[in-house]
Curated annotation (Swiss-Prot):
ATP binds at residues 328-334, 349. The active site is at residue 384. It comes from the Bacteria. GO terms for cellular component: cytoplasm. It is found in: Cytoplasm. It catalyses: L-seryl-[isocitrate dehydrogenase] + ATP = O-phospho-L-seryl-[isocitrate dehydrogenase] + ADP + H(+). One of its GO terms (biological process) is glyoxylate cycle. GO terms for molecular function: [isocitrate dehydrogenase (NADP+)] kinase activity; AMP binding; ATP binding; phosphoprotein phosphatase activity; protein serine/threonine kinase activity. Keywords: ATP-binding, Cytoplasm, Glyoxylate bypass, Hydrolase, Kinase, Nucleotide-binding, Protein phosphatase, Serine/threonine-protein kinase, Transferase, Tricarboxylic acid cycle. This is Isocitrate dehydrogenase kinase/phosphatase.
Length: 607
């Protein structure tokens, strides 16, 4: 039962609510400014600038939360505000959000501020937004006609599609000229005809495109949908810099699976300017019904909102399931304890209190590695993580063996409490949550010859794409990689990662005498950050099927020259091209030399 006050009698309550909303409004204004700046950086080809924008934006949220807390402490002694006043603060805040264009994000910001001031015993709907209070439906009706959430175009006929797409692209007003937009728009129309065949044009035949471009890595994406009769189809057109220095439309993506990969949890967040983010999410969910709202908000760079929605989805799942959390199957890690709920497609990772040999690390160092991944372009090859503190789980849902494992190996990370409903709970002080995947070592052990071949092809591609993005995985055992439902290999164990540019790529020196040659021990000096690619075969090529696949697809993997080549390019300032689709889909391959490739090289497929 709610205990909200009947009267809003406190001026301080209103002032605090206003201060908190001002903090959020500042955050979202800066968030949008970065997204607008991304367009300018893309136009001039400032790839390092785009990467810096991405890193800066990730830090914005916590900076604004901290600023708001400092203001509340200085002006209102926030820690001493009485419970009844906090309830009035929430009600005032709801009132201030009535006509707000980002109410769901503002509610999450309120939660972030409050939960860093008050004890977790207050984390309920009387004080924070456990459930949303303001609807986000149809907010777009109040948008400016100058830039609505999406624009509608009417080709009129199959023959009118090329001119329609030319108009769509021109409406984004990119400052850099196109190499041949008429040609590329014709390719888009041709690809659509090839995909759908000679389809019948319905009276409602139209194309909708979101009004802002989606920026990531070195690509700008037009995101849209085609409506014809009762059917809706996704449509994505990537725009890249060509070798000529001008812009080209690289391809058109029309398969829903392709779009799912584009919005995968293994990719960096998009930078996109949104006045009404909930309207963008609604549009994208129409294209990707299998994606949760939490996943889509996260892909749009609103990871705190995604994290909030994920937790609500998780609580809902707990209410409607009865299985128990268990220790995750597979080889135990030396740094993390990993557990899972079989009915829920995620794993929970807790840093151990003690690290057995040969691991030499600390809790803070491990957390810094995970933060590095959060800020880096994951190029479709590193799983995103959700980081939570003080998460309360029903103790009755934990397997006894898992509880003993946590008590033995991570006692400082857990405590017990009783909920307001009188239920025993286990509180995990710090946890990472990741999408559950099939460990690659299990995939290779149990797979058919064809699956093994695919797994090794993907593994080699994943490592090569990571080092091209300046990430050295460190521990490259197969158990540290997973296979997604799309068959892609993704890295997910980050405690040993380093920047490749910080590593010394070395060849094993020749033995100086017979004793060294016959020695089972390393006879040469190994310094910190030294890597010896030719030694990796010792722990990667034990299985004959794996060895055959490796030699077939990646014979250069164990050659130090390949690794040094990537390092040299990175040190020279090169930014690699990573696209989340097969190179065969590109117009340059489909329609010949008239379609020009990127300014540097053939992009890797990062999907």
């Amino acid at each position: 039962m709610s205990h909200f006050p009947k009267l809003l009698s406190s001026q301080i309550a209103y002032d605090v609510a206003r201060t908190m909303l001002d903090g959020f409004d500042k955050h979202y204004r800066l968030f949008r400014e970065v997204s607008i700046e991304a367009k300018a950086r893309f136009e001039v080809g400032d790839w390092h600038g785009l990467q810096q924008l991405q890193r800066d934006r990730i830090a914005f949220y916590n900076q604004r939360v901290h600023e708001t807390i400092v203001t509340l402490q200085d002006e209102y002694d926030a820690e001493d505000i009485e419970d009844e006043i906090w309830q009035q603060i929430k009600l005032h805040y709801i009132g201030l959000l009535t006509n707000h264009h980002q109410p769901e994000l503002a509610e999450t910001f309120f939660n972030s501020v409050f939960t860093r001031i008050q004890h977790r015993s207050y984390f309920n709907n009387d004080f924070i937004f456990v459930r949303p209070a303001i609807s986000t439906e149809y907010i777009e009706n109040e948008e400016s006609p100058i830039k609505p959430t999406y624009r509608a175009y009417y080709p009129g006929s199959r023959e009118g599609m090329a001119a329609c797409f030319e108009r769509i692209v021109n409406n984004f007003q990119l400052e850099r000229p196109f190499e041949d937009l008429k040609r590329d728009a014709g390719y888009v129309a041709r690809a659509i005809t090839e995909h759908f065949g000679e389809f019948r044009i319905a009276p409602n035949f139209q194309v909708h495109t979101l009004s802002s471009l989606f920026f990531r890595n070195k690509t700008a994406f037009v995101i849209g949908r085609v409506i014809n009769g009762d059917h809706t189809y996704p449509l994505v057109v990537p725009i890249i810099h060509a070798a000529s220095g001008k812009l080209v439309l690289d391809t058109v993506l029309l398969h829903r699976e392709q779009i799912l990969i584009l919005f995968s949890f293994a990719h960096a967040y998009f930078m996109v300017d949104m006045e009404i983010p909930s309207a963008y999410v609604t549009f994208l969910r129409d294209l990707l019904p299998r994606k949760s709202r939490a996943e889509i908000y996260t892909s749009l760079g609103l990871q705190k909102q995604g994290k909030n929605l994920f937790y609500r989805d998780f609580l809902h799942h707990l209410q409607h399931s009865s299985d128990k959390f268990i220790s995750a199957p597979g080889i135990k890690g030396l740094v993390m304890l990993v557990f899972t709920l079989p009915s829920f497609p995620y794993v929970f990772k807790v840093i151990r209190d003690f690290f057995p040999a040969p691991k030499e690390t600390t809790r803070e160092l491990v957390k810094s590695k995970y933060q590095l991944v959060k800020q880096h372009d994951r190029v479709g090859r590193m799983a995103d993580t959700l980081e939570y503190s003080d998460v309360a789980f029903p103790l009755s849902r934990f397997d006894d063996a898992l509880v003993r494992e946590l008590e033995q190996h991570a006692p400082s990370m857990i405590e017990y409490q009783r909920s307001k409903q009188g239920e025993d709970e286990i509180v995990v002080r710090h946890v990472y949550i990741e999408r559950r995947m099939t460990p690659l070592n299990i995939w290779l052990q149990e797979g058919t010859d064809e699956q093994v071949d695919h797994g090794i092809l993907e593994y080699g591609n994943a490592v090569k794409e990571l080092i091209a993005a300046n990430i050295f995985p460190g521990d490259m055992l197969y158990k540290n990689f997973g296979v997604t439902r799309h068959g892609r290999v993704v890295f997910y164990d980050y405690d040993e990662i380093e920047y490749l540019t910080d590593c010394n790529v070395r060849r094993v020196p020749a033995p100086r005498n017979e004793e060294e040659e016959m020695s089972g021990e390393v006879w040469y000096t190994v310094r910190p950050h030294d890597i010896f690619p030719e030694t990796y075969g010792t722990f990667l090529l034990g299985d004959p099927r794996v060895r055959a696949a490796f030699m077939r697809h990646h014979p250069d993997f164990f050659d130090a020259a390949m690794w040094q080549h990537h390092k040299d390019r990175l040190l020279a300032g090169h930014v690699h091209d990573f696209f989340a689709y097969h190179s065969q889909e590109r117009f340059i391959h489909r329609y010949g030399s008239g379609a020009t490739g990127p300014a540097t090289e053939e992009p890797r497929r990062a999907a």
